[in-house]
Amino acid sequence: MPKLTTCLALLFGLLLGGSLAAPAFASDAGPSGSDSDTPYIDLAPAFVTNYDGGGRLRYLKVDVSVRARKPTDEAVRHHMPYIRNSLVTLFSSQLEENITSTDGKEALRLTALEEIRRILTKLDGAGAENILELYFTSFVIQQ
């Protein structure tokens, strides 16, 4: 019985010690000054749309994030419905051969980036150069 008690005390000590160390470790992992000035913005929820599959109904699901300098990140959030509408239209207009290749996905990514820049220029008059990148964090095709 003393051996069991010793093992339990040791286990409890390890668990407690690990939980106390975790907050200090997490605080060191914060963003650096330059990264905090260019936040990532998830355009959630995922875009789910059908696309031209040569007569068959096919679906595309895309998760998108953009990286924007402040204060343009607030403009992206403010105009999110307009941006999402334009991207849904863009994604649904794609042909199957354009989205199944790596080059096609890259071209679509760049087109989506330019579309967001165009929208912000149109609605805010400036700030398009502050949209640094657009990333597909998930890209699923149902064929």
List each language-model region with its residue ranges.
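Flexible, low-complexity charged segments
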Residues: 1-143
